[in-house]
C-alpha cells in the first residue's frame, strides 16, 4: 500500500502550500468531472515510481481542551498514528514559537519518524533559519520554501526513503492466485461489517488474516460460487471470533489506501440517509485512482416506495459523475441483492482489464465520427484518424489525429459513451487521451 506522509504544524506555517505542491500532479485528473467535490485535506503525490498519500492535518494545538481546536487536534493525532513519516513544519520567518515546542514534545513520544522542516526560508542563510529550531531536539532542520519549491524535492525524497524502508514485502498481496481484490468503503454505520459477513458467512469462509503492508491492515481470502476474492483492509473492520465488527474510529487514510490497493471498490451507501459530502469525496478518490466501481445502497428493505424514489433521485443528482457504475439496492442484513452485486463486481473487473484490439477500436472511432462529427473551432475541424489501447485498469484509449486541441469536453463524453457501449465497459472509469498523429498514412486518401 502507499505510504502516508502527514503534514503537522501550528496554523499559518505553510502546510496547505506544501500540500498543494506535493499533490499538484493529481489535480487535473478530476477537474472535469461534473458534480465532484474534493476533500483537500487528503491527496496523492508521486516521485518517479513511488506514489504516496499526503495528509494536511490543519493547525495543531496539542493542548486544546474543547471546541474546534480540540477536534482538529484529535484528527491530527489520528493522522500521526496512521502516518509512516511525519513532516513537522515550522515558520522560518517568525522563528520558534511556544506552540512549536508543545508539538515537538508530543511528536517525540509517538515513535514516528519526524522530519523537521523550516518553511518560508527563501532568501535566508541556512544558519540564520535553522539555529533556533535545534532546541526542539528533532535533529537537523531542513530549510525549504513551499511557495517557491526550494528544497521540497530533496525533502520529500528523503521522507520517502524512510517511508518505503518501513514497508513490508508486498509479494503476498500481489499474488494473482488470490483472486479479485475488493475494498468495501463507506461512511461509518452504513453496514460494511454486515456486508462482509454476508459475503464470507461461516459456511463459505476460506479466510485467514494476514499482516498487510501498513499497521493493522487485514487481507481476507474467500470463495463465492467457485470464484476467489480477497477483501483488503476494510477500513475500520476487525475480526472478533468468526465475525467482523466495525471499530469505533473511521479512518480516511485507511479508506484511501484500500481503494488504491483494490481491483474493484464497492461503495456502500445507507439508503436511509442522504448522500453526504464524505460519500462524494470517497467516490471521487475511486475515480481519481481509476478503480472499477460498484455502488451498493444498503438497508433498502427499510424504505417505502416514496422513500425509495427519493433515495434514487438523490443518488442520481449527487453522484452523477459515477454514471459508469452499476447501482444495487440491497439488504446486507437479510442477504438480499448480494448475488447481483457480486456479479457486477466480476463484470466491472472484466471491463477494467479488457483488451481492446486496435482494428476494433479504430472501427468504433470511425463509426462514431461518421454518426456525429466534432464541431469546428473557427475554421478548424478536428480530424480523428485511428485509436489504440494505451493501458488497462482503467482502460486507456489513445486517439490520434489532427487539430485535437479543438475537441470539446462534450465530444469527449460522446466518444466515451460510444466506446463503453461498443466494448461493454460498464463499471470502470475510462480514460481517453488525444495525441497528434504521426501515422505516415494519416493524410493519404
Swiss-Prot record:
Keyword vocabulary terms for this entry: GTP-binding, Nucleotide-binding, Repeat, Ribosome biogenesis
UniProt gene name: der
Pfam families: KH_dom-like, MMR_HSR1
Family per record: Belongs to the TRAFAC class TrmE-Era-EngA-EngB-Septin-like GTPase superfamily. EngA (Der) GTPase family.
Identification of the protein by name: GTPase Der
Matching InterPro entries: AAA+_ATPase, G_ENGA, GTP-bd, GTPase_Der, KH_dom-like, KH_dom-like_a/b, P-loop_NTPase, Small_GTP-bd
Family matches, as Gene3D superfamilies: 3.30.300.20, P-loop containing nucleotide triphosphate hydrolases
Matches recorded under SMART domains: AAA
Gene source species: Burkholderia ambifaria (strain ATCC BAA-244 / DSM 16087 / CCUG 44356 / LMG 19182 / AMMD)
Residues noted as binding GTP 1 in the record, renumbered to the chain: 9-16, 56-60, 119-122
